[in-house]
Amino acid sequence: AAHREERYAALAIIRSKPSVSHAGRMESLALYEHFLRTGQWWDLVDETSHAVGLVVREHPAAAARMRAWATDPDMWVRRSAIICQLQHKDRTDPGLLSDVIEANQEDSEFFIRKAIGWALRDYARTDGDWVRAFVQAHPGLSPLSRREALKRL
């Protein structure tokens, strides 16, 4: 897709009809990664990350790919690895969440720091004690990440 609108249309189909669009298949990660690397803006990356999350939730093997993405030179790929488990609630893999955040906790980029806080705040709705302990154990988290993580606790 050459235009943002086409990508948004594709992502809308993926989200509305995941079983028909094969959204949660491991093979779909290649398309999502292409969107991340070529979309290069937060709104498209965040929407794509929800689709990535479908794969992560259905295929435990995708966690290894997210750990690799967490250290990728491309900031948007790293952001996706951090936020791909949003809204997974009790199906969130805290080990994966911890690993992708730890790989990025000292990054000074706003979009990474915000993603860390967002991912932690979202998981706090499910396991606030885990998030409090994580934030306390990671003094290297930026003030923005800490504030966002603890906002509703």
PLM-predicted stretches and their roles:
Residues 1-153:
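Alpha-helical scaffold domains
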